[in-house]
Design a protein with these regions (language model features):
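Divalent metal-dependent hydrolysis catalytic cores, especially in the metallo-beta-lactamase
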Residues: 90-116, 127-136, 185-196, 225, ...
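His/Asp/Glu-enriched, well-ordered alpha-helical/loop segment
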Residues: 221, 295-379
């Protein structure tokens, strides 16, 4: 047993913060009890961590990351920039840094193989709990189909452990979903619009309705959720009408109120990924810059309208194109877009766990759930950016195991 006492508790469910709280963690890595300090009985000789003056909250969750990606250059995206051994070690370092920054769960939306989960289970590396898409799907000439402006084409996956992800037609799409599931996917990710390409804009549809329905149906048959990259236009509509579980980006969704209602009614999540579009607006290629700048205000409007419509908006960065380790920047951008700090925190905890289908075990500080907890020096409800200061992340616990402890040195 281990008890945290005296801190200001933010539960991840949007409840009123609890001052002078107590959280008791049992030896199985679960939360045994939570409540006001005077209402939680501690076992005899229970170790106590006094977090008075600090904030205790659930471990943060990024619903859209790419841990194996480093930039948008073709040589890197095609796996040609370095030996695979160097990339594996680089990813392991990124995973550890991500965990130590307070992120205890990541949904990786493409190109990370199941070996990293196995390595964590074997104690070879440390990192957040992982939900993997392995290979995203797209049709020929879609986002997953890698070709350069010069016409060069990459006919195989840059990772030989992963399927290529290219499929055309309902039957081939079903077969590719099965391949991706075989490769260890927890979630099926597909691209149904482009973005930042001369040949595929954010409003260009990738798959037709029959293909999308086949994809979603096959994924759900295998018990997998479906995440769809879609910016706007027919590709966005096709995905939502087919019943995808989350829309990634959705910048132009606010233009279609009926789709917002449909998402709210069927429980689909919106992952706006403001961070990556902030990058693209200033540092992307010319096509990406133009689209990101054009979409900026519509993107903000979409999130505001989604919240009003009852759509659950969750935090995801699309990290990997530019940098790793500053995932909490997304929460600052969500607040700048009109969400309250509490809404942004729920978007990165309780609702984020729901997006991953893990809300029965993580995301909130509740009795019986996994002890994924962080302690922060500061009040993120007063200043959400405090979560970006790694020196103010005082403790990180995942499954009851402490991975970062700056409290004992105080």
């Amino acid at each position: 047993m281990l008890a945290f006492i005296g801190g200001n508790l933010i539960d991840g469910a949007g409840g009123t913060p609890l001052a002078d709280a107590a959280v008791l963690v049992n030896g199985r890595g679960r939360i045994e009890a939570v409540g006001p300090r005077g209402a939680v009985t501690l076992p005899p000789n229970c170790p106590v961590v006094n977090v008075t003056g600090l904030t205790l909250l659930p471990g943060l969750i990024d619903c859209h990351d790419h841990l194996t990606s480093f930039g948008y250059e073709f040589i890197g995206r095609w796996g040609l920039a370095e030996p695979r051994s160097a990339r594996v070690l680089r990813v392991a370092k990124v995973m550890e840094e991500t965990l130590l920054s307070g992120y205890t769960a990541i949904r990786d939306c493409g190109w990370l193989d199941v070996g990293y989960k196995q390595a964590m289970e074997q104690g070879l590396i440390t990192g957040p709990r992982l939900q993997l898409a392995t290979s995203p799907l797209s049709p020929t000439q879609g986002t997953q189909d890698r070709s350069s402006p010069s016409g060069h084409h990459q006919p195989t996956s840059p990772d030989p452990n992963l399927p290529r992800g290219i499929a055309d037609g309902p039957d081939a799409v079903r077969a590719m979903v099965r391949e991706v599931v075989r490769a260890g996917a927890d979630v099926i990710k597909f691209f149904n619009t482009g973005f930042g390409r001369a040949t595929q804009s954010g409003s260009t549809r990738s798959y037709d309705p029959d293909e999308v329905r086949a994809l979603v149906d096959e994924a759900h048959i295998h018990g997998k959720t479906v995440a769809c990259h879609a910016i706007g236009g027919p590709g966005l509509r096709t995905a939502i009408e087919a019943g995808v579980d989350s829309i990634e980006h959705g910048c132009l969704l606010g233009q279609e109120p009926d789709l917002l209602k449909m998402m709210a009614d069927q429980g689909s999540y919106l992952v706006p990924t403001f961070t990556v579009f902030t990058f693209h607006a200033t540092q992307g290629n010319s096509h990406a810059q133009a689209e990101a700048q054009e979409f900026r205000q519509q993107h903000i409007d979409t999130v505001q309208q989604a919240m009003l419509a009852g759509v659950k908006v969750v935090a995801g960065t699309d990290a990997g194109g530019w940098e790793h380790g500053n995932n909490a920047k997304e929460l600052e951008l969500m607040v700048a877009a009109g969400m309250t700090p509490m809404q942004a925190l729920v978007a990165a905890t309780g609702w984020a766990a729901g997006c991953l289908g893990l809300d029965d075990s993580i995301g909130t500080v509740e009795t019986g759930k996994s002890a994924d907890l962080i302690v922060v020096d500061g009040d993120p409800l007063a200043d959400i950016s405090v979560l970006q200061d790694k020196n103010r992340i005082r403790l990180v616990m995942k499954d009851g195991q402490v991975y970062l402890d700056r409290l004992s040195s105080d």
